[in-house]
């Protein structure tokens, strides 16, 4: 009975801790600290924009990279590829053959493996494989908090590519962020949801870094 009460108290304390915005600020900053918000036209030039799909904001940013001539092709991927995102990209003026849809990937690892395979199949006008002519420069488009894990997976599953982070959807380092203030210490359900997402990113990063060698 005493152990049961202790477990309840421990669970309550952990839940309360993860409900604090200040905890999310620290966790999120640890993931986003190496990246900055950047206008699409200021992103270094690459060959391919790899949109690790999942939201219209990422789809929009990836399309803007192509329109700004930062990339020649756009590969958008995700679980079944959100048709709304694909339609948005087309509506923004990026269409096939510049746009390539990956409808098979179920996670980030498969996103990258499939994109590598697709790039390896492309040929120059003279028939020479594009991948044989130079190392690919890949603009990796995903949320800022997901970028550390995405870059790790790029090094692991597409090692010959020069991966260039093109982060979007910042959650902590937003230009309009209030930073730490009094309500950073007030628990909320929104903070709990964000903090669990941050925690999941750390777990995913560690799993690929140390367990999946």
Which residue ranges define each predicted feature?
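Cytosolic-side transmembrane helix boundary signature
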Residues: 1-10
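A structural signal for short, hydrophobic/glycine-enriched beta-strand patches
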Residues: 12-191, 195
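Structured C-terminal subdomain patch of bacterial secreted/periplasmic proteins
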Residues: 190-213
């Amino acid at each position: 009975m005493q152990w049961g009460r202790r477990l309840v108290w421990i669970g309550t304390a952990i839940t309360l801790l993860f409900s604090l915005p200040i905890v999310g600020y620290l966790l999120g900053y640890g993931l986003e600290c190496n990246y900055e918000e950047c206008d699409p036209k200021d992103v270094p030039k690459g060959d391919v924009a790899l949109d690790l799909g999942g939201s219209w904001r990422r789809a929009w940013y990836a399309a803007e990279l192509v329109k700004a001539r930062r990339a020649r092709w756009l590969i958008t991927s995700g679980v079944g590829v959100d048709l709304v995102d694909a339609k948005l990209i087309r509506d923004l003026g990026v269409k096939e053959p510049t746009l390539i849809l990956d409808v098979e990937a179920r996670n980030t690892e498969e996103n990258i493996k499939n994109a590598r395979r697709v790039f390896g199949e492309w040929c120059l006008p003279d028939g020479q494989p594009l991948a044989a002519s130079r190392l690919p420069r890949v603009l990796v488009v995903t949320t800022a908090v997901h970028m550390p894990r995405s870059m790790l997976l790029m090094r692991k599953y597409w090692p010959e590519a020069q991966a260039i982070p093109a982060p979007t959807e910042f959650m902590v380092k937003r230009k309009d962020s209030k930073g730490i203030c009094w309500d950073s210490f007030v628990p909320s359900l929104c903070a709990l949801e964000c903090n669990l997402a941050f925690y999941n990113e750390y777990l995913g990063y560690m799993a690929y870094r140390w367990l999946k060698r």
